[in-house]
Amino acid sequence: MLRVRYAHERGKSHPAIHWLRGYHSFSFADYYSPQHIHFSHLRVINEDIIAPQHGFDMHPHQDMEILTYILSGTIEHQDSMGNHTQLHAGEFQIMSAGSGVHHAEINPSSEHDVHLYQIWILPKSKGIAPRYEQGCFADTEGATLILSPEAKDGAFYIHQDMSLWRWQLSLEQSAVKTIPLLPTRRYWLQLVKGQLRVNDVLLNTSDGLAITHENVLQIELIQNSEFLLFDLV
């Protein structure tokens, strides 16, 4: 079964936060939709555009796996574990809040927005030691493993029974792609950019797709596309 989460139907950040254009696939902050609380262990998928010299001041998190993916621009990260660094376009960051962590995320640019996805994943156990990783992955055609409970093939470790793959497909090399699935697992596809059909369902940039009880995804590209595919219990 396929259920589309259209980009234009997502929740939006509060208009009083003038420096933020945020779009929420699931209930978050002032946005509440009883039909969109979570999907499996996915609790938050936020697409944020943050204005120059603004961002989120130091604030707490606990018992959450937090993934950030920078699409354009730069974000400056600082946390209570002693990390103080910048993430640039194409970089990923994973942080286990665990027993408790404070962090801040600020756009240091005086000119350019930062465009990012932030994704919260419920961990399989509470109270773990906080941790932090960041890095880039190969910008190649096809699938790249980003998160894995075994941290295999260079992926970041995730404290949950799930994996995350980034798919980058071009019309020149992969106009049609078949991705086998396990019907006992649940999957979420988030289209970062492009346009494609998934089992004859049309998706545009920023659309999401909840996938259950399916054996295969038949991907037909309409434009060069990038998507995140979450493999969930």
UniProtKB/Swiss-Prot annotation:
Which residue ranges traverse the bilayer? none
Q: What reaction is this protein's catalytic activity? A: quercetin + O2 = 2-(3,4-dihydroxybenzoyloxy)-4,6-dihydroxybenzoate + CO
Function per UniProt = Putative quercetin 2,3-dioxygenase.
Q: Which EC number applies?
A: 1.13.11.24
Q: Name one Pfam family in it.
A: Pirin_C_2
Q: Which family does it belong to?
A: Belongs to the pirin family.
Q: Which UniProt keywords apply?
A: Dioxygenase, Metal-binding, Oxidoreductase
**Cofactor-binding details, from the entry:** Binds 1 divalent metal cation.
Q: Which InterPro entries match?
A: Pirin, Pirin_N_dom, Quercetinase_C, RmlC-like_jellyroll, RmlC_Cupin_sf
Q: What is this protein called?
A: Putative quercetin 2,3-dioxygenase PM1685
Q: Which PANTHER family would you find in this protein's record? A: QUERCETIN 2,3-DIOXYGENASE
For the ligand (a divalent metal cation), the binding residues are 59, 61, 103, 105
Per its UniProt record, the required cofactor names are:
a divalent metal cation
Q: What class of enzyme is it?
A: oxidoreductase
Name the pathway. Flavonoid metabolism; quercetin degradation
Q: Which domain of life is it from?
A: Bacteria
Q: From the Swiss-Prot or TrEMBL record, what is one GO molecular function term?
A: metal ion binding
